[in-house]
Amino acid sequence: MPPKKAPAGPSKKTEQKKKEKVIEDKTFGLKNKKGNKQQKFIQQVQKQVQAGGHHPRQDGDKKKDEKEKKLADLREMASIFKPVQTQKVDKGTDPKSVVCAFFKQGLCTKGDKCKFSHDLSLENKVEKRSMYVDMRDNEDDLMTNWDDAKLKEVVDKKHSEEKRRPTTEIICKFFLEAVEKSKYGWFWECPNGEKCIYRHALPPGYVLKRDKKKEDKPTEISLVDLIEKERAALGSNQTRVTLETFLAWKKRKLQEKKAKMVAEEERKKSDFSKGKQFGISGREMFSFNPDLVDDGPIEEGDAAFDVYKREDDDDDNAFEFKELDLAALSLAAKEVDGSGTIASSTRLLDQATEAAKTAAAEDGAASDDENPSSSAPANDAAPFNKDLFVDLAGELDDLDLDDEDD
């Protein structure tokens, strides 16, 4: 009987839809934001979800390992074939003081025309000169290998060198300067010459200034490592953030802020009473001593004002806190009272009756106003003169009036 096939996993489309759903949930309401922080957060979430939860540092370590492997392969190939590279000489250096690289490999075909030296004895001078050894302190050879001529030569040189040897342990400033600037080498010569009485060697344990700067430079740490380090330093015994702990923390912070403000105000009042006015604003000065406002009679151009003492009301600045309890809120909830908000079935009939009563009342008031005015005589009317405009037509004909249009 063949073995059972393993259950097929979810398809790629299903996985992609799940990832898109997760991205949409985490970035809800942020896609239309144009801020730089929001866009960076969206890109970070997309990378994390698409990577399937892999830590970004793992990918970085993998790339680093691949790069180191390639460099190791290149070094191995170079050690096998040993290709001769074209020599480059620094500016100001004599090429004859450098041994030809092709000549050492037996590949130089230029002979005497080669600009580099073919003297292999220069190999010893190519070695870096030690900064901790003074070349004038060389020990003499053993006397067992000397002959008479060598002994005489050594005696003469010994007495002559005693006059030229350094007589102090102070280090030469030119030597220190050359070492600090990386100019010290086989071809370096002291400006004081061979007769320089100062030491041309560093004492044991001496640290150069350039090395001190490298040691003082702080080691750089990546953001991911810093976050992981801080998280590990927190430990596991931490308070979980809930509604109750947050409200308690907020209450404590507000009380601390209020106490700090009161203490600061008391300190400023104490300083002001002692005559110290540094750090006190003008408003605080007048609030501490309102008598400063009444500084004399009002002059021309001054504004009138009134002075009064304001009583401090601590109740205005009091803060009340109330903890939210979901169980108490659910018990206090009750059904909404609908009295006065639900329309009755006879509302239309009541409106018609009220309108009829209002119309009847208005008609009665209008009839009462018309009857007294029609029955009462008009005793206050002025008498009318019938002959007032009899001769007015003749007077109008005698007037010479010019037409305004002319």
Curated annotation (Swiss-Prot):
UniProt cross-references to PROSITE patterns, sorted A to Z: ZF_C3H1 (PS50103)
Compositionally biased residues, Basic and acidic residues: 12-28, 56-70
GO molecular function annotation: mRNA binding; zinc ion binding
InterPro entries associated with the record: ZC3H15/TMA46_C, Znf_CCCH, Znf_CCCH_sf
One annotated GO biological process: cytoplasmic translation
Sequence segments annotated as region (Disordered): 1-70, 336-382
Coiled-coil regions listed: 57-82
Listed GO CC annotations: cytosol
Residue spans of biased composition, Low complexity class: 1-11, 38-50, 352-364, 372-382
Annotated family: Belongs to the ZC3H15/TMA46 family.
Full protein name: Zinc finger CCCH domain-containing protein 15 homolog
